């Protein structure tokens, strides 16, 4: 691994900030000051930042987070805090989300440092299903289930959505399971049906269900069974 990448991930800096710190003699490898961020390092090396020994994070980290409203799933956003505020560095710098939720959508987000694993979840060819609890502004109509099962043509698109499963819970709440990830898909599906989504909560990805014991903003590691369920 490059030294500047390691420093950025472990200290919580951008790559350019890490490079600047290295040039300013803030980093030592095995007791020697190093001023080049391109130096390759390994876990056998002792890396110091401002005289503090940094620890290596093992590869293969998998978590579920109960995302609250008001934060985004990107690593950096000028308008909203990100979900990575809930994780301490150096861990936060190594994770990415396997799929995203809008700023006003709550619920299950999966995070990992394993790119191949997350690709299996997000790639359209794997058809990983996601289930949402949807709260609507107007009462549910009888034709919604059939319309979702047949596919709905969204505004501005040429192809209808893939068949989706809709379970009516009461007059204003439904569970919707989709296998795509189009832009604002759930909201646009109900807009096409003449309704409006006023609450959206993802509680299931594949066969993994959001842990009910997690408060908003809390996370826990996935079990080995959960990790394997998502790539079976």
Swiss-Prot record:
It holds the Pfam family S4. It is an enzyme of class 5 (isomerase). Disulfide bonds: none annotated. One of its GO terms (cellular component) is cytosol. SUPFAM superfamilies: Alpha-L RNA-binding motif, Pseudouridine synthase. It catalyses: uridine(516) in 16S rRNA = pseudouridine(516) in 16S rRNA. Its EC number is 5.4.99.19. This is Ribosomal small subunit pseudouridine synthase A. It comes from Haemophilus influenzae (strain ATCC 51907 / DSM 11121 / KW20 / Rd).
């Amino acid at each position: 691994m490059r030294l500047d990448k390691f420093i950025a991930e472990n200290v919580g800096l951008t790559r350019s900030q890490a490079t600047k710190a290295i040039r300013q003699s803030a980093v030592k490898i095995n007791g020697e000051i190093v001023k080049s961020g391109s130096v390759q390092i390994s876990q056998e090396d002792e890396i110091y930042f401002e005289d503090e020994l940094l620890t290596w994070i093992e590869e293969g980290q998998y978590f579920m987070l109960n995302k609250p409203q008001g934060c985004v799933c990107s690593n950096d956003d000028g308008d909203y805090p990100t979900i990575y505020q809930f994780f301490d560095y150096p861990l936060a710098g190594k994770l990415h989300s396997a799929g995203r939720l809008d700023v006003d959508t709550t619920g299950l987000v999966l995070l990992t440092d394993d790119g191949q694993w997350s690709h299996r979840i997000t790639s359209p060819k794997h058809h990983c299903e996601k289930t949402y609890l949807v709260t609507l502004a107007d009462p549910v109509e009888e034709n919604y289930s059939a319309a979702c099962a047949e596919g709905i043509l969204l505004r501005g698109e040429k192809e209808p959505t893939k068949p989706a499963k809709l379970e009516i819970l009461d007059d204003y709440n439904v569970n919707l399971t989709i296998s795509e990830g189009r832009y604002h898909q759930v909201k646009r599906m109900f807009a096409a049906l003449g309704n409006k989504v006023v609450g959206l909560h993802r509680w299931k990805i594949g066969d993994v269900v959001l842990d009910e014991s997690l408060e908003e903003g809390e996370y826990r590691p996935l079990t080995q069974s959960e990790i394997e369920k998502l790539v079976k």
